[in-house]
């Protein structure tokens, strides 16, 4: 009887109440990664949505980008982190670690064994049992502060180690006030010379003894500054189970502002703060309600949505007068207004920012305001910011992020400054960080492409992305009512993808300064003319004009054959450009999807291109394959780098049944819905209801607001008015639906004649 009832209940749909969405989040998803193979390269970010400060249990050595790995056996401390990626690494770091017995500062010696069986990680609360010390450590964050609690055994030798890290730090112990203050300067680049992360710590117990530490040596006195300083605060614990609490906050502006930020904690205790954090997370995640039978699918979905609302990070603070202010990571001054950071637009322009525009537009309006401030403070929009300009990746995709926001209806920020910024960035390169602006713009503007043989790497990738970015600027300018004289160059350059298409191979190919194509040419060679991919991946990076690409290839049939080949080719590769097999290659190889590389961004949209070529059922098949096979709510849950929300946002959109192939069009290309029911609660009070009936992945029939719908795309403007979308799914493809010319989504060639 029990068994029958159990399986009957399991077969019923699990309805997620919007108040409880956070309970499905698995922060450890993607954390079982290393240098050679990424299953996410994530860490459990204990934080608020878009929070200024994140917290992480630190298992890696100081300075190691892999600061938490699932396979690790020991924890070195509870660390404040601002790391967006292990490849970018961290800044503004310090940690607290409880120890018992001999006061030990060295991170190797103080590290304690732990088990995932005695670890609890949620977005708003973390706890772990530190076995070597019989101590339970707890943490609950706000946006800029945190409350920690350390439950000790009965002992006269309980300690909390405060590590300000190396590369320049300062600490001051104030025993009479139960306080410790300091700053850290450790960073990984992208900061002015005066960069500091000021931190303040306030305990609820009297100090029994204190030690200051400088460069590995215990010092007399309560104040130290040097390469690597810290403090050890000692307590007497009268009974087992007694808790020592620490209120912690930080500021990039000054110590006084850090004390201002600690007021976020108020007088709340751990339970109250956790409830506040839980409520906040449910407000954000609950914007999307999901109903389905498979609880692991729900866990995966909400874990991906959690990752989609962490970055970009808020880099602003509120002063004592209630004003929004920020330390500028570009010029080192304190300015009024918003600032956000820790995102790479090469990754996130694709669908992370479109997700914000659909579900959280008020957040992106602040981000856009911050982008205008970035331009004012540095002369360029960022392409990879952490916290300032970083030399990473290619493209000028800030143009996409800015244009898509405005074209999606976002307002209330300095649009004219952003127009000036995108035009400037299209015709200049940052004097010190050549990944900001356009490296090779002189060649591109003159020839229509970046040549392969002028010592500018990844030239085809740059050309393709610049062409799309020019289209974005053109669309943005049209919406602003700019003159044809201003717009004409961008419209013309939007076709520059044609300049690097090789008719002989049917693929994009490096082109020399003299106009000839590179030779020899191996379309399976990663890097070289491309960025973290090969010609089979990058040929499809004509987001704004798939019909134009189709014509270059010779029509729909050839286009479909070439797209089929991506999945049919074995996962062979040439890694000679790098001299070793980079992790992105290995991730493609082991996933058994041919040469499709979902673990990296360049081809993540490619699955949806069948909707342009009259074979949408193939998109439906491959989308479902990726979602079923390449995402799980486990420590190895991704198939490559999660990348600041991009790979997660792909899952979120794809679960809805549509995806923004070309940000800036206002269209979503249809795939197949993943859940039986979804409700999207928009900020304007409207609601999008998505229903799916039937088994299988193929869309047999679709209705929009009660009317039969044949097209392979949805318009954002229609959805934002509120919509009812229903799908009837089948185990067999419907090869008649969505096959007409009029069913295809937007392509620039069709609108620029």
Predicted features along the sequence, with ranges:
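Extracellular glycan-interaction patches encoded by glycine-rich segments
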Residues: 690
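Bacterial Sec-dependent N-terminal signal peptides
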Residues: 1-16
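ATP-dependent phospho-/nucleotidyl transfer catalytic cores
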Residues: 469
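Accessory carbohydrate-recognition regions in carbohydrate-active enzymes
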Residues: 14-353, 357-400, 406-464, 472, ...
């Amino acid at each position: 009887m029990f068994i029958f009832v159990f399986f009957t209940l399991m077969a019923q749909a699990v309805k997620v109440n919007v108040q409880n969405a956070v309970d499905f989040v698995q922060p450890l998803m993607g954390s079982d990664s290393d240098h050679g193979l990424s299953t996410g390269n994530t860490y459990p970010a204990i934080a608020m949505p878009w929070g200024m400060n994140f917290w992480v249990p630190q298992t890696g050595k100081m300075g190691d980008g892999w600061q938490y790995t699932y396979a690790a056996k020991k924890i070195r401390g509870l660390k404040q982190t601002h790391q967006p990626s292990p490849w970018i690494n961290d800044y503004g770091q310090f940690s607290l670690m409880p120890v018992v017995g001999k006061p030990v500062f060295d991170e190797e010696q103080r590290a304690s064994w732990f088990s995932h069986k005695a670890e609890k990680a949620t977005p708003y609360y973390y706890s772990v049992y530190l076995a070597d010390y019989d101590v339970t450590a707890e943490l609950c964050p706000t946006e800029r502060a945190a409350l920690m609690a350390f439950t000790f055994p009965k002992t006269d030798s309980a300690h909390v180690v405060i590590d300000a890290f190396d590369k320049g730090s300062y600490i001051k112990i104030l025993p009479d006030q139960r306080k410790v203050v300091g700053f850290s300067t450790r960073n990984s680049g992208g900061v002015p010379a005066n960069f500091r992360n000021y931190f303040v710590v306030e305990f609820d117990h009297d100090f029994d003894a204190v030690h200051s530490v400088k460069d590995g040596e215990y010092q007399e006195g309560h104040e130290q500054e040097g390469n690597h300083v810290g403090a050890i605060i000692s307590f007497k614990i009268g009974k087992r189970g007694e808790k020592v609490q620490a209120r912690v906050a930080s500021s990039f502006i000054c110590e006084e502002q850090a004390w201002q930020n600690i007021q976020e904690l108020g007088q709340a205790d751990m339970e109250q703060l956790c409830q506040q954090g839980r409520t906040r997370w449910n407000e954000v995640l609950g914007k999307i309600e999901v109903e389905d039978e498979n609880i692991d699918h729900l866990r995966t979905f909400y874990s991906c949505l959690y990752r989609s609302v962490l970055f970009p990070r808020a880099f602003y603070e509120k002063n004592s007068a209630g004003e929004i202010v920020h330390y500028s990571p570009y010029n080192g001054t304190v300015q009024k207004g918003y600032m956000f950071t820790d995102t790479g637009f090469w990754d996130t322009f694709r669908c992370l920012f479109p997700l914000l525009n659909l579900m959280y537009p008020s957040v992106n309006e602040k981000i856009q305001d911050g982008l205008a401030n970035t331009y004012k403070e540095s002369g360029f929009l960022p392409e990879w910011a952490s916290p300032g300009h970083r030399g990473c990746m290619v493209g000028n995709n800030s143009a996409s992020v800015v244009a898509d926001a405005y074209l999606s209806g976002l307002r209330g920020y300095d649009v004219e400054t952003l127009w000036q910024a995108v035009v400037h960035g299209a015709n200049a390169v940052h004097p010190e960080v050549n990944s900001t602006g356009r490296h090779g713009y002189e060649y591109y503007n003159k020839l229509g492409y970046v040549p392969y043989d002028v010592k500018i790497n990844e030239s085809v990738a740059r050309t393709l992305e610049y062409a799309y970015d020019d289209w974005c600027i053109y669309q943005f300018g049209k919406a602003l009512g700019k003159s044809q004289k201003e717009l004409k160059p961008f419209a013309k350059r939007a076709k520059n993808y044609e300049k690097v298409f090789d008719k002989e191979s049917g693929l994009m190919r490096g082109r020399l300064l003299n106009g000839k194509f590179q030779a020899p040419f191996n379309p399976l060679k990663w890097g070289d003319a491309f960025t973290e991919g090969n010609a089979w991946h990058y040929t499809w990076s004509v987001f704004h004009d798939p019909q134009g690409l189709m014509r270059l290839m010779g029509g729909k049939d050839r286009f479909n054959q070439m797209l089929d080949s991506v999945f049919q080719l074995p996962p062979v590769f040439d890694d000679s450009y790098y001299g070793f097999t980079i992790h992105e290659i290995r991730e493609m190889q082991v996933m058994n999807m041919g040469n499709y590389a979902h673990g990296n961004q360049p081809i993540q949209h490619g699955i949806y291109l069948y909707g342009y070529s009259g074979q949408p059922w193939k998109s439906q098949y491959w989308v479902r394959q990726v979602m079923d096979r390449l995402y799980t709510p486990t420590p190895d849950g991704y198939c490559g780098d999660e990348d600041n929300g991009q790979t997660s946002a792909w899952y979120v959109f794809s679960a809805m049944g549509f995806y923004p192939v070309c940000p800036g069009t206002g269209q979503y290309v249809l795939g197949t819905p993943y859940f039986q029911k979804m409700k999207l609660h928009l900020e304007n009070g409207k609601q999008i209801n998505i229903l799916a009936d039937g088994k299988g992945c193929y869309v047999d029939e679709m209705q929009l607001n009660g009317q039969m719908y044949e097209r392979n795309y949805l318009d954002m403007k229609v959805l934002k008015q509120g919509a009812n979308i229903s799908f009837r799914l089948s185990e067999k493809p419907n090869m008649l639906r969505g096959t007409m010319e009029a069913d295809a989504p937007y392509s620039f060639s069709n609108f620029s004649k």
